[in-house]
UniProtKB/Swiss-Prot annotation:
GO terms for molecular function: aminoacyl-tRNA deacylase activity; ATP binding; metal ion binding; threonine-tRNA ligase activity; tRNA binding. Its EC number is 6.1.1.3. Keywords: Aminoacyl-tRNA synthetase, ATP-binding, Cytoplasm, Ligase, Metal-binding, Nucleotide-binding, Protein biosynthesis, RNA-binding, tRNA-binding, Zinc. This is Threonine--tRNA ligase. One of its GO terms (cellular component) is cytoplasm. Residues 242-533 are annotated as: Catalytic. The gene is thrS. Gene3D superfamilies: 3.10.20.30, 3.30.54.20, Anticodon-binding domain, Bira Bifunctional Protein, Domain 2, Threonyl-trna Synthetase, Chain A, domain 2. It is an enzyme of class 6 (ligase). PROSITE patterns: AA_TRNA_LIGASE_II (PS50862), TGS (PS51880).
Amino acid sequence: MNDITVTLPDGSELSVPADATVEDVAYEIGPGLGRDTIAGVVDGELVDATTSVYNDARVVIVTEQSDEYQRVLRHSAAHVFAQALQREYPDAKLTIGPPTDDGFYYDIASVDLDENDLETIETEMEAIIDADIPITQQYQSREEAFSKYENNPYKCDILETEAADEDPVSFYIQDDFEDLCQGPHVDSTGEIGAITLLNISSAYWRGDEDNDTLTRVYGAAFESESELESFLERRKKAKERDHRKIGQELDLFSIPDITGPGLPLYHPDGKKILNELSSFARSLNLEAGYEPVETPHLFRTELWKQSGHYENYVDDMFLLDVSDEEYGLKPMNCPGHATIFDQHSWSYRDLPVRYFEDGKVYRKEQRGELSGLSRVWSFTIDDGHLFCQPEQIEQEVTHVMDAIYSVLDTFGLEAHVALATRPEKSVGGDEIWENAETQLRSVLESQNIDYDLEPGDGAFYGPKIDFAFEDALGRQWDGPTVQLDFNMPDRFELTYTGEDNTDHQPVMIHRALYGSYERFFMVLIEHFNGKFPLWLAPDQVRILPISDDQLGYAHRIKNELSDFRVSIEDRAWTLGRKIRAAQEERVPYMIIIGDDEVSTETISVRDRKEREKQDVDLSTFHSHLKSEYENKRLEPDFIDMN
């Protein structure tokens, strides 16, 4: 049997027999690593340590020290849950139970559970873990598998789809429990240090609302009790910062049933924040040489066929029949921008050409996947597309990265960066891919940006740089992407005249500074816990007259601060109640005025940190507001600086 070459994470290569397992590869590297091997990652896929490698591949060995080990442990925790469930509810039908970032979920049918049942199941899970039951992989024939699941249509569905080419079929066994599964898993249940069941929700089989409704149970799993306790504390804080809760408290947005799922309504205060975000993005775009464009909400499907979206994305599109002609609400803005570029003749001297648009798009996500502002049907992208020569990629991506980091700095956000390179199936020649990836690496390294390399994770039409925002609680959220595109210019036959006086195809670069306004708004609500910086706050200053006697002075102050969003609290409340209301609404500044302030024509300033300064000259405070706003400082700092 011929040898194959496996490439290790450090780039070194190892020659092994063509049927070598992941564990064999580990022992070739060293006996200590071989003994510690839990699983492996082969060409990006997490697999069992006993999985054979038959072709040249990239191989990563997974041990208890690896990041991937957590997914293995949590997958095993899902099996412990399923075993405990079947002991308590033998008639329950198991479907799928994948790992998540903090634990797992398991979808089940034919059983009614409520939150009170979780404690009983959790107690049984702990008994299974304490028993330290070995977890082993076994293979069974397809006939045996179908016979085993003759009363479980969900497992039969898996056998007919994901496992259609498997014979024999992989199962994992632990004592009296077995499950159709590819793994990998830990060696025994005792390796799972700490678990808890979190909550129950509903889900559709396959995420399709036309299928059966299932019961979904979420759980958390960690190596130690201390890690679990830390997670539960973070989870508690996250619930307090939930953007849906704060959005309702501050009257920022709503998603009522009558409007339809995933279709948010922005209330006046929410729209004020979005306007500020849009204005900031617009200023960065204009400064970087982008020109504003606008495209309609729908196009004839001929455009989507030319762009390739109709072929690959039609199930996620909203289609309309208009006078016997088919139209589609746009799921993306890029075909419209490519069409604008195509309306002109371009020379190499004109490039790069840069467009930007706050473009509303529509994507038909499954209803079960919709969640607040993070997953919606209708959302707006601060979309930018630029068209350049291949040799201009590095300079243009550098400018985009500068703008993205300006956004991060402005909002006090951290980001994790990843470079995703050419996948197995791609369009475009070797030379243009190698040139593009080299230029992207050069940008990242010249700016000293730490990044993860994700081989093969690029889009089929070009490599990309992905950003994940990290908020105040250390959680990561999908952020901007800088995506090179060799496909759309080809589909639209976009050209420019080169120095050699012949036609050349430009490279298209997709980029957004926020990602989408909806998701970024969600991140900001939770990151700031509703305590927005002055420049974003919908109500920037609240004037609190002690009595109606000061209302005239209050209106004079409001007029002098007319370049800010100022309100007057004129309800017949005590001063204490007025202050509490402003605090609850996270207003950055309060101006308190009584008879003394009226007589001296001064103000008392209180910030939301409950600090106060008296005898303040209004013009001094006004000047400070301008400075704090223009510099987009994150916290109200008048008291600190005066």
